[in-house]
Structures are given as structure tokens and as C-alpha cells.
Amino acid sequence: MCSIGEDDFGDTGGLHAMTAGGPVQIATGGTGECQKCGQHSDDLFKVNFRSEECRDCFLNYARHKFRAALGAAKALPRDSDVLLLLDGSIESIVLLDMLHYAQTQNTFKRLHCQAKVLYLDESVVQEQQSLDIDRLQKLQDRYTPFDLFVIELGTDLSNLRPLKNYTPKTSREESDLKIKLDKLRTLSARQDYLQQQRKRFLASVAHQLNCTHVFVPSISKDLATQFLTSIALGRGGSAALDVALCDDRLDHDIKLLRPLKDLNEQEVQLYVRARNLEDLKLGPSLATYGQEKGETASLQNLTAAFVRNLQENYAATVSTVFRTGNKIAPNRHVDQDMCQQCQSPLDSLLSDTLLAIEYSRVVSLEGSKLSNHNNDLEQLSMQRLNKDDRLCHACRNVQDEYL
């Protein structure tokens, strides 16, 4: 079975890379002999911890990571119906290019699945100009015969349209999703709530299009950030699924797959150069939601800044962080109920830590009134913990942020 060696990522304990250095450099290319195939090349590609190689050898290496991620875990059954998320990021275009290449190979090497592409118009949340249909049409023309669908985030599924039948709205009413976001007091709560709603919306669209799997373009840097963010937000019990290849918590038994999880930022940029891909800047992406408010505006922004600093100075550490998440088993029990918001296992009955957190919160809010009544403090703590037993700890915190 196809697999990926740890040496591909420079993770031999991380010891060889644990010295501070400058920002990751993207080589501009040069001429010489490919160290992989021995052929002369006018445009060499240099990935950290690998020898210089020609364009074809580099593309084989990058595409191997994509295929190996899916093949090693047998995560994608043969002839599955797949929905690929195109979110406007360059990573999503790389994922589209890799999937198209895998679909157009001969029978032996072909990735046997039926793929559709979804562009999720997120401008309704970002309050920015809607997408450029002409640019999206160029993308569909390049990646024929994939069917491309478009829908605005948070709208009714009846608005799902093939690209040829889609017309951007010149004026729009404020969506229910935007109204709910505006009622949340903190940016951390808004970003967390938006991420959960986006996953549920993707599952609904996939179900509407009769797809059983969803491809998302998360790379190692994104997953390292997500892993640390999940822990900081109180989602430690489900953090492993937030960074795993396969997340099976979605509605309608839809499985969310991250086939680019083993690619880093440098490899993505080199792949863009090798394939002459263009960042079409299709529209705003949720990856940038709230970033304009600064690094300290939310836990998510602060964590992303921390991981970027690691990427610049300790390149191999980012891979180590998200691989740590892969080694953590999800906290699941057969008879355990699931959170109605994020579909993670409910954790309120499994940990005394949550009771201690609520106790501290009650002391802060009611301590001056109940200083001589410890039993009352404990009772209030239990009431807060059980006031909505359908939500996990993190989603309950989001609910507490509503104005």
C-alpha cells in the first residue's frame, strides 16, 4: 500500500531542524542535474530536506503525497461520489488540479471516484464584493469535465446552482447567519461558530448533490493551527478529528477528508509554480475572516500568528504539532450523546475539570453574594453545567457570548 515516509517531512525527531532561522525561502529555480532522475533541467525545484529535482520529479513527489494520504488509510472507497470545496484559496486550486490529474490518468493509475466541485460564496459573511463569475468560468473550462456548483454560505439549499445558471445577487438581505454572528460579543466566538456552521452547511450541500465525501484544502500549517486552537477553545476531546484525514462527525454520514494534510506551504507554492497555476482571487474566504482586526483580536488569530512564527523559524515543528494531533485517539464511547452544534461527543459528564471551570465562573459572578454558602456555589455550578445538556463545553461557551 502506498505510504509516506517520515523522512519526506524532515521529522526524524525534529532535531535537525530545531535551530532558529529566517523565513522559509521559496527557491526561484536554477539549471542543473536532477538528483532524482539524473536528467538535465532548466528549472530545478528545491524542497527543504530534499535534493534539487526537476519539474516532473517534484510533481510526482507532491502528487504522491495526495494519493498516499487517501490510499494509506483506505479513506476513499472505489467509485465514491466526492464534493471538492473550492473556497478561493490557492490551496483549493492546487487540490482541484491534483484531483483532476488523478482523474485523467489511465485506468491503472486513475483515482476512481465521481467528483463535483463546489464554490462556496462567503462574501455574505465577509461583507465584501461577490465573486467574479468570469474567473470562475475560466477555472471550469480548464478542469473539464468537472461539474461546478455555486451557493452562498448559509442560504437555503434551493439556491444551489450549476455555474452556468448562477447569477450573483446585486443586493442581498442580511442572512440569518450574519445576524447570529453580529449577536456574538467576541471575535473568538464568531470565528468558532462560523467554522462549525460551515462544516454543517457543507454536509447538507454534499447530501443534496448525492455525495458521500467532501474534500477540503487544509494543509499542514492549517491543521497545526486548528489543533492548537481546538485545545485553547475547550475542544480537546475532539481535537484529533479536527486534524485527522477523515472527520466522520458530519450530518447525513458525510465524511470530510483532508487529502493535502501532508503538504506544507513551501510545497504548495512550488506546485503552483510547476503547474503555472494562477491565484484567481475568486472572492473572500473564511480563512481570512477577522484577520484584519489584528493578531490579538481572538484566540484563533493569536494561534495562527504563533504557528506562522514557528513556520518561519522552526519549519519542521509545524509538521510535528499537527502529527501529534493524529496520534491522539478521539474521545468516544458507544453510548455517548453528540453535541447538536458540532457533532462532537458530549463531555459534560466525563470530566470534573468542567465543573471546576464553572465553579470558578460562578465565584467570579456571584462570589460576593454567596461567600458563606459553598453548597450554593456548587449547586449553581452544576446548574450552569447542565443548563443545556445538548451542547459540548466549547459550544456552550459560544452560546454564553450571545448579547
From Swiss-Prot:
Function: Plays a central role in 2-thiolation of mcm(5)S(2)U at tRNA wobble positions of tRNA(Lys), tRNA(Glu) and tRNA(Gln). May act by forming a heterodimer with NCS6/CTU1 that ligates sulfur from thiocarboxylated URM1 onto the uridine of tRNAs at wobble position.
PANTHER family per record: CYTOPLASMIC TRNA 2-THIOLATION PROTEIN 2
GO molecular function, one term: sulfurtransferase activity
Cell compartment(s), UniProt: Cytoplasm
Statement: the UniProt record of this protein carries the keyword Chloroplast: no
Sequence similarity: Belongs to the CTU2/NCS2 family.
Pfam families registered for this protein in UniProt: CTU2
Organism: Drosophila willistoni (Fruit fly)
Keywords: Cytoplasm, tRNA processing
TM region positions: none
Location, primary (coarse class): cytoplasm
Name used for this protein in its record: Cytoplasmic tRNA 2-thiolation protein 2
GO terms under biological process: protein urmylation; tRNA thio-modification; tRNA wobble position uridine thiolation; tRNA wobble uridine modification
GO cellular component: cytosol
Pathway: tRNA modification; 5-methoxycarbonylmethyl-2-thiouridine-tRNA biosynthesis
